[in-house]
């Protein structure tokens, strides 16, 4: 597909030619190879993204001079399982798929590389940039996150101020006040004050706070550029703007990462207004760090 603002071409690639993706490129070459963004699946949603958000973002970025590859990981969407990788873990297989996608982009004339994804795609993106020095930036939409002291105050505080809640507790019809109060106290004092991981992730898959911090420190040392976007779909884990920065107080994360908090938006950006917000934020971040006038 070709028009005045972008061209799109489908590719089969990978070790077994089992991966399928669509490369979107800007119409005219600039002074050098265009930067490129690899969009990574969110769960089992194929390469168009939730509510076609990846398609929208890829075309918006093409208008800013960037290439994009929307592709399916092994066994998802149009991609099949590889014939020669049956002995590796799913996590390792997905990282090899991402490596293959980045190599394809470079063969097609793409310059600086960026990875992007929503939810599990964000988590895969963070792993990919940490293990692959070819990648200069990452866009992380509703990624894994740690709760903080303030998270619990924001979460429980309004409930503790409701007269009806206290009345039920005083009349013996509810234990919720005591339970909430004990939870708040335990989380904001003593050894429980450290940031805590998302309880929905198993202990075998969730990184520790120290591991996550070490990964961020490595990326900061390399000069990587990160964009974190959190939506209202993640309020049970992320409920105020600076929670990410508060979770890592020893890091100067603000110097390397930009943060957007969209509490009105849902997790899949289902409304046009939410998609417009995300598109504008991503384009602004791209222009600042990777666009034609960005400082290298």
Mark where each language-model region is:
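The alpha/beta-hydrolase serine catalytic core
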Residues: 89, 134-279, 285
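Alpha/beta-hydrolase active-site loop
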Residues: 86-108, 127
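Gly/Ala-rich beta-loop-alpha elbow adjacent to hydrolase catalytic centers
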Residues: 116-125
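Glycine-rich "HGGG/HGxG" loop immediately N-terminal to the catalytic nucleophile
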Residues: 71-88
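Short, surface-exposed "cap/lid" segments of acyl-processing enzymes
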Residues: 26-72, 236
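N-terminal cap/lid segment of alpha/beta-hydrolase-fold proteins
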Residues: 1-35, 271
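Short glycine-enriched, charge-decorated loop/helix-capping segments at active-site entrances
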Residues: 53-54, 83-89, 275-276
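Aromatic pocket-lining residues of Rossmann-like dinucleotide-binding sites
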Residues: 61, 128-129
């Amino acid at each position: 597909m070709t028009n005045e603002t972008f061209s799109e071409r489908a590719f089969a690639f990978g070790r077994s030619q089992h991966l399928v993706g669509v490369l979107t490129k800007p119409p005219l070459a600039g002074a050098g190879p265009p930067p490129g963004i690899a969009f990574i699946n969110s769960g089992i949603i194929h390469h168009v993204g939730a509510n076609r958000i990846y398609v929208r973002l890829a075309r918006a970025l093409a208008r800013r001079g960037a290439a994009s590859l929307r592709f399916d990981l092994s066994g998802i969407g149009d991609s099949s399982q590889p014939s020669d990788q049956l002995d590796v873990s799913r996590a390792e297989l997905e990282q090899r798929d991402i490596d293959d996608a980045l190599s394809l982009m470079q063969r097609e004339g793409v310059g600086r590389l960026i990875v992007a994804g929503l939810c599990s795609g964000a988590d895969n993106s963070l792993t990919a940039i940490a293990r692959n020095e070819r990648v200069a930036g990452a866009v992380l939409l509703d990624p894994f996150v740690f709760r903080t002291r303030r998270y619990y105050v924001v979460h429980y505080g309004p409930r503790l101020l409701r007269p009806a809640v206290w009345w039920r507790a005083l009349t013996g019809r509810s234990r919720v006040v005591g339970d909430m109060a004990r939870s708040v106290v335990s989380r904001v004092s003593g050894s429980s004050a450290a940031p805590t991981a998302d309880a929905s992730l198993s202990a075998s898959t969730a990184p520790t706070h120290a591991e996550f911090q070490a990964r961020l420190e490595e990326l900061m040392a390399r000069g990587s550029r990160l964009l974190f976007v959190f939506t209202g779909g993640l309020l049970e884990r992320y409920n105020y703007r600076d929670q990410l920065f508060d979770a890592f107080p020893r890091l100067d994360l603000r110097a390397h990462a930009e943060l957007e908090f969209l509490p009105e938006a849902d997790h899949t950006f289902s409304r046009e207004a939410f998609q417009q917000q995300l598109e504008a934020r991503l384009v602004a971040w791209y222009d600042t760090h990777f666009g034609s006038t960005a400082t290298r």
